[in-house]
Swiss-Prot record:
GO terms (BP aspect): translation
Protein name: Small ribosomal subunit protein uS3
Record-linked InterPro entries: KH_dom (IPR004087), KH_dom-like_a/b (IPR015946), KH_dom_type_2 (IPR004044), KH_sf_prok-type (IPR009019), Ribosomal_S3_C_sf (IPR036419), Ribosomal_uS3_bac-typ (IPR005704), Ribosomal_uS3_C (IPR001351), Ribosomal_uS3_CS (IPR018280)
PANTHER family the UniProt entry points to: 30S/40S RIBOSOMAL PROTEIN S3, SMALL RIBOSOMAL SUBUNIT PROTEIN US3C
Species of the source: Neisseria gonorrhoeae (strain ATCC 700825 / FA 1090)
Region ranges (Disordered): 210-230
Assembly behavior: Part of the 30S ribosomal subunit. Forms a tight complex with proteins S10 and S14.
Gene3D superfamilies: 3.30.300.20, Ribosomal protein S3, C-terminal domain
Record carries keyword rRNA-binding: yes
Length: 230
């Protein structure tokens, strides 16, 4: 199951948290969800060069709080904060409620799956060979401390007539282990030959320890050994 399912959804409430944190009545749910999708699409286009890794949307009492995780916060804020004010106005029009925007810096962008995927997509759009772009991103991630990384690209690679998929992996990426901290992201590269799809898995340190007491697990192991001996 871990091979097919979205790794982020698979690990929600274990090592991952929700990107949208709000509650809505069943009659309003579709409207609020559509607003979230519009906001994310707008930010993806507006901040294409700001290396945005994650956008968190919260909706406390008749307002909204948006947290943008970016490797280049200066690009998001702009000179003297001009760009962030324009951003707030546009988001307020989209959501129809007062907006508060927080900017958080990503310290190690080489380990952020979304930034890696978007970076490779931009290189593919500039006609960089896909193997070179993928291997360079993998080397940077492993050099920065990743325990494993896997990158897959699909489509008309190098302008081939028949679409195919190629993937490369370095280190280990345990997709079945729920406590493993696996960051997953997708992106698209729009080239003259069509759209190329990208998927990135990054495995970093930060496994969650078992909540069971250590002495309890030892007692159970001892009990199993005694049962096997009898």
């Amino acid at each position: 199951m871990g091979q097919k399912i979205n790794p982020t959804g698979f690990r929600l409430a274990v090592t991952k948290d929700w990107a949208s944190k709000w509650f809505a009545k069943s009659t309003d749910f579709s409207t609020v969800l559509k607003q979230d999708i519009d906001v994310r699409n707008y930010l993806r286009q507006k901040l294409a060069n700001a290396s945005v890794g994650r956008v968190i949307i919260e909706r406390p009492a008749k307002s909204a709080r948006i947290t943008i995780h970016s490797a280049r916060p200066g690009v998001v804020i702009g000179k003297k904060g001009e760009d962030i004010e324009v951003l707030k106005r546009d988001l307020q029009v989209l959501m129809g409620v007062p907006i508060h925007v927080n900017i958080e810096e990503i310290r190690r962008p080489e380990l952020d799956a979304q930034i890696i995927a978007d970076g490779i997509a931009q290189q593919l759009e500039k006609r960089v060979q896909f193997r070179r772009a993928m291997k360079r991103a993998m080397q940077n991630a492993m050099r920065s401390g990743a325990k494993g990384i896997k990158i897959m690209t699909s489509g008309r690679l190098n302008g081939a007539d028949i679409a195919r998929s190629e993937w490369y992996r370095e280190g280990r990426v345990p997709l079945h282990t729920l406590r493993a901290n696996v960051d997953y992201a997708t992106s698209e590269a729009h080239t003259t030959y069509g759209v190329l799809g990208l998927k990135v898995w990054v495995y970093t340190e930060g496994n969650i320890k078992s909540s069971k007491p250590e002495h309890e697990s030892k007692q159970r192991k001892a009990g199993r050994r005694n049962a096997a001996a009898n």
